[in-house]
């Protein structure tokens, strides 16, 4: 076997030991292999993906190789749903939560990285254990990234996690109480609706698009149940289309005390938008 072949063989063995979290064989071989930064990054990236906790701790404690940045490891351990990057959950010891516990023992500071992303991704996965662990370790900021409320429904609809964060003083930047209420209504999350009402949400603060989507998702009864004031729609009455509906709408009006034209506005919006 040539020298290069031997080096490549040993590198393959090291990768195998990292995947298996075989610390004994890893330590026996690592000193025999010249690890440049690129290969060190590769090994510790694999270790992060595989939740090879023994290997990672050894590398941190010895600085034997240049490792994948710690804050990037934590991103993998928390999970990146938008990119499909996750640490594997193999058993009670080799899993993403245990890896997070290990990583958070070390300095995770990186001035160029928004730490709010950790909490955002944990909440998006509805992973209460990860959310609690991050908050307990001082990560108490979450930024709701998108201005489109339908993209944040996974956060708003997790009202129990939202409650935990609020109760524990997390700074939730970009949080919109009306969008949170809307998300729970269209998801038929009655407990979430009740919670958001309790902390100040108002059904009549919903914007028109939210009202339309609630009707689109067959939740119009919820608007009646929560006493939405349909007559707020007066400002949209100057629309000739609203005069083209039959007498069936009058029956609806008689049963609900809603102005006919306001119902027409909603129906025309639904047809034009969806």
Swiss-Prot record:
Show me the ANK repeat boundaries: 78-112, 114-144, 146-174, 176-205
Source species, domain of life: Viruses
**Record's keyword terms, sorted:** ANK repeat, Repeat
Which named protein is this? Putative ankyrin repeat protein R597
- Which organism encodes this protein? Acanthamoeba polyphaga mimivirus (APMV)
Biological classification of the source: Viruses, Varidnaviria, Bamfordvirae, Nucleocytoviricota, Megaviricetes
